[in-house]
Amino acid sequence: MDRKVGTISRGIRCPIIREGDDLVKITVDSVLEAAASEGYAMRDRDVVAVTESVVARAQGNYASVDDIASDVRAKLGGETVGVIFPILSRNRFAICLRGIARGCKKIVLMLSYPSDEVGNELVSLDQLDAAKINPYSDVLTLERYRELFGENRHPFTMVDYVQYYSDLIREEGCDVEVILANDCRVILNYTKNVLTCDIHSRARSKRLLKEAGAQRVCGLDDIMTAPINGSGYNEQYGLLGSNKSTEDKVKLFPRECTDLVMAIQAQLLERTGKHVEVMVYGDGAFKDPVGKIWELADPVVSPAHTPGLVGTPNELKLKYLADNDFADLKGEELKTAIEGAIRAKGDLAGSMASQGTTPRRLTDLIGSLCDLTSGSGDKGTPIIHIQGYFDNYTN
């Protein structure tokens, strides 16, 4: 019988991961035990993926509010600091902000509008239109924002982030002034010491600030890049990709992940004889069409992966072939013709026959699949096993 199933993505249950656990052994054992219990076999070019959260937990990669405060104070002077373009998230930024506030005397908090970088709205575009506000040029004080738009709560969490962040800063004994603007250089009218908290546009923000005369400029990726009093750290991403662990501690994005994925690949090869690709994944980079949230608060989808996951898909669009090249064929004759075209394909970059085949990196595509499979709550499946991803219609 012809094969009837293509790509399969399985969430693999494993023990709760604690600091110091052997994640290589746990991952390999869990994947092989799942395969044995469900009656399927490992194959060459399967993909095993591990969520960044359990990697960081096993590493013990944590930082406290006091650690963050100490680093902010050392790098930005401890006086008045402009904190610009943070995302609106209790999980992703609130504990970091508590540490930042503890390391300053005053924060000028500059929020982007109508939404943050990943789509959390402070106001709607319709509200801006009605108020005749130009988000590209207009700078709003807190008073003007409240006068025009009142209280705006997040549609899902019902949090008024302007009030929430202001209260959090004051709780740390730090003064706060709130403005809304979208040009990072506006902050230099208030202070020359700036912590730019954007994620994917951070390099440009830093460049513009330095060119405009800022004295001290850091991004979140410059805070917690080395241990503070024995804390965790991430030399490449700092606080980027961190999230709440407790009320006074964050879990940092994992480090040294390449050694992990290569070790998992080697153990799977030793125990199964199969060459399996391995990656660590975080946010899946998909966008919610209703809430308008871009699921990429991490600096990258995958901080590490085996070499076989480098590149982009090289695929033909079956419906294009069926509707154009082989429009006069049907049934077995059409199937044979399409299989022949697939077997004969070369590099399809720029080819009309490949249009609509999602030109994204493999790690980003597979990371989306993994994040959607594992979820972010109580499924208990931080390991994903994907089979058939690299197969096509001929396999």
Regions found by a protein language model. Give the residues of each.
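Conserved mixed alpha/beta catalytic, RNA-binding, or beta-rich assembly cores of soluble enzyme
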Residues: M1-D44, S53-N395
